[in-house]
Amino acid sequence: MEILVYIIIGIAIFILSLLVGINIGNRRMISTLATKKEELEVEIKNKQKEIEKMLKNAEEEAKALKQKELLEAKEEIHRLRQEFDSEAKQQREELKANEERLIRKEESLAKKEENLEKLKEKLEVQHENVLKLEKELETKLNEIAKMTEEEARQVVINEARDKYEREIAQKFKEIKDHYEEESKKYARWVITTAIQRYASDVTNEITTSTVALPTDDMKGRIIGREGRNIRTFEKLTGTDLIIDDTPEIVVISSFNPLRREIAKRTLEMLVADGRIHPARIEELYEKSKNEIQEYIKEVGKEAVMRVGIKQPHLEIIKLLGRLKFRTSYGQDVLEHSIEVAQFAGMMASELGLNVELAKRAALLHDLGKAVDHEVEGSHAIVGGQIAKRYGEKLEVVNAIQYHHNEVDPMTPEAVLVAASDALSASRPGARKETLENYIRRIEQLEEIAKSFRYVDKAYAIQAGRELRIIVQPDKVEDEIAEKLAHDISVQIEEKVQYPGVIKVTVIREKRSISYAS
């Protein structure tokens, strides 16, 4: 641009010089030219300023264009860098994934190699066991070759028993545990509900009764001349009359509660009457017998009313009343029967069974005990026969006869009666037994346990309500111990008579002892 300006200025000066040379003589023209020159110089200066301004604007535009292109170039570089970083990151991730995949494959191969090594060791052990078993079989075959047929048969039986005993015991335990858990939950709820809703007095066996006397002089009159009164009294009543130094008291002793009650009533009437001689004793004895028969009938009716069942035959009511004067392990049999009926009724109601049938069979379940000293047979069978004779339904008869497992049950109510009987008998304090029976039962329990194979020791504890059995730990495994406990409990049920429930516990203990010196 500067060159262009200089060219223009040069041309202008040339023209002016030409004009000056032509019109040298013409001052006016010179003056005009001078003026034109000045104007031209001013115009040149203005043009120069415009040119400078245009150059400046051009420079600014070029600078702006340069900055724009530079910014676009930077943005393009930034974009390319981002694309490069993204591709690099993706490649790094792919490399990392491939690396992890290779590591996993290496680990998998290492694990497979380890498993193969273990399998190899296991196969080697099995191979050794097979070789050992082959040697044992060879030895056994040599032994069997020398045996008789019976001896070989016994060996095979023993091997089969040892081989499958554990498997059978395990299966038995699984089934037993499953059904026990389910049944115990519901049975526990039903029995607990029945016990909570019923409570009765604890009874004890009493073999004596006392009669109060107005004065000690009455003792001599009771004895009579040469003891004839006391002999007559004891002969008629079948009791023993104990007269000692205890003031104003006479004791009547007998194991038969009915005889003892008749004797007590007879003696009380004799003392109240004051006339004591053999004829009067016989008269009042007969009167007491008649009164006690009426009392027995009333007691039977009251029992039926307490239980809340339909009236049975009159003879059955009388037999129920007689149970008032019978005891079993010290427990009043009539009160026990009422208690069993209440338990059976409540549990039948909870289970949705026939409440009337359960109560009726439960109340009559010990009916045979009223006549078991007169009729041969177990009281359960005899009781069922009596109930059948006096018109009771077959279901009631079956429940009576089943309650000691002497026949098969026909109805769920029969099983319920047996359970209620056991529940009443096992209630704490409900029953007691003589020392002789107790010792015999303890010995019998321990003998049954010791009769089983691999039993080392057996102890009956908690008054015979628990049997603890110590077995040989190297011969009996846990599963077999479970089956052993079951088998012993079955033997006890079959061979031992006992009130309540006996818990059988098998203990398998192995101790390893070492000494450091």
UniProtKB/Swiss-Prot annotation:
<feature type="domain" description="HD">
    <location>
        <begin position="333"/>
        <end position="426"/>
    </location>
</feature>
<dbReference type="InterPro" id="IPR017705">
    <property type="entry name" value="Ribonuclease_Y"/>
</dbReference>
<dbReference type="InterPro" id="IPR036612">
    <property type="entry name" value="KH_dom_type_1_sf"/>
</dbReference>
<dbReference type="InterPro" id="IPR004088">
    <property type="entry name" value="KH_dom_type_1"/>
</dbReference>
<keyword id="KW-0694">RNA-binding</keyword>
<keyword id="KW-1133">Transmembrane helix</keyword>
<keyword id="KW-0472">Membrane</keyword>
<dbReference type="GO" id="GO:0005886">
    <property type="term" value="C:plasma membrane"/>
</dbReference>
<feature type="transmembrane region" description="Helical">
    <location>
        <begin position="2"/>
        <end position="22"/>
    </location>
</feature>
<dbReference type="GO" id="GO:0004521">
    <property type="term" value="F:RNA endonuclease activity"/>
</dbReference>
<keyword id="KW-0812">Transmembrane</keyword>
<dbReference type="Pfam" id="PF12072">
    <property type="entry name" value="RNase_Y_N"/>
</dbReference>
<dbReference type="InterPro" id="IPR003607">
    <property type="entry name" value="HD/PDEase_dom"/>
</dbReference>
<dbReference type="GO" id="GO:0006402">
    <property type="term" value="P:mRNA catabolic process"/>
</dbReference>
<dbReference type="Pfam" id="PF00013">
    <property type="entry name" value="KH_1"/>
</dbReference>
<dbReference type="InterPro" id="IPR022711">
    <property type="entry name" value="RNase_Y_N"/>
</dbReference>
<feature type="domain" description="KH">
    <location>
        <begin position="207"/>
        <end position="267"/>
    </location>
</feature>
<keyword id="KW-0378">Hydrolase</keyword>
<keyword id="KW-0255">Endonuclease</keyword>
<keyword id="KW-0540">Nuclease</keyword>
<protein>
    <recommendedName>
        <fullName>Ribonuclease Y</fullName>
        <ecNumber>3.1.-.-</ecNumber>
    </recommendedName>
</protein>
<dbReference type="InterPro" id="IPR006675">
    <property type="entry name" value="HDIG_dom"/>
</dbReference>
<dbReference type="InterPro" id="IPR004087">
    <property type="entry name" value="KH_dom"/>
</dbReference>
<dbReference type="InterPro" id="IPR006674">
    <property type="entry name" value="HD_domain"/>
</dbReference>
<keyword id="KW-1003">Cell membrane</keyword>
<dbReference type="GO" id="GO:0003723">
    <property type="term" value="F:RNA binding"/>
</dbReference>
<dbReference type="Pfam" id="PF01966">
    <property type="entry name" value="HD"/>
</dbReference>
<comment type="similarity">
    <text>Belongs to the RNase Y family.</text>
</comment>
<comment type="function">
    <text>Endoribonuclease that initiates mRNA decay.</text>
</comment>
